[in-house]
Amino acid sequence: MRKIKRNDEVVVITGRDKGKRGKVTRVLPDNRVIVSGIQMIKKHQKPNPQLGVAGGIVEKEAPIQVSNVAIYNPSTQKADRVGFKVLEDGNKIRVFKSDGNAIDA
């Protein structure tokens, strides 16, 4: 089970976007995540008339290391760490380390 999943709200803890918040749009297999509005890069796109793509400079999100983000805890309004807890029925859930509340409610 991963600590950071798709649609989690995260805070960037290191790098040029430190302190910014965003939603995880994709989790890549090499321990990287794509967060909306974070790590924006400019890509020089060639026009492709067959696909209907216009050329120019396109801004898009680049992947960021999962170790450089922390999950956002809405109750404390701060970045938090993720822990795991096994319920009595055998299911494993993610919890916030600071207060023990379940992330996947």
Swiss-Prot record:
Entry keywords, A to Z: Ribonucleoprotein, Ribosomal protein, RNA-binding, rRNA-binding
**What stretches pass through the bilayer?**
none
Q: Which InterPro entries match?
A: KOW, Rib_uL2_dom2, Ribosomal_uL24, Ribosomal_uL24_CS, Ribosomal_uL24_KOW, Translation_prot_SH3-like_sf
Q: Single Gene Ontology BP term?
A: translation
Q: Name one GO molecular function term.
A: rRNA binding
GO CC terms: ribonucleoprotein complex; ribosome
Database matches in Gene3D superfamilies: 2.30.30.30
SMART domains per UniProt: KOW
Family assignment from sequence similarity: Belongs to the universal ribosomal protein uL24 family.
Subunit composition? Part of the 50S ribosomal subunit.
* Protein's job: One of two assembly initiator proteins, it binds directly to the 5'-end of the 23S rRNA, where it nucleates assembly of the 50S subunit. One of the proteins that surrounds the polypeptide exit tunnel on the outside of the subunit.
Record PANTHER family: MITOCHONDRIAL RIBOSOMAL PROTEIN L24 (PTHR12903)
Q: What's the protein called, per UniProt?
A: Large ribosomal subunit protein uL24
Q: From the UniProt record, report the name of the gene that encodes this protein.
A: rplX
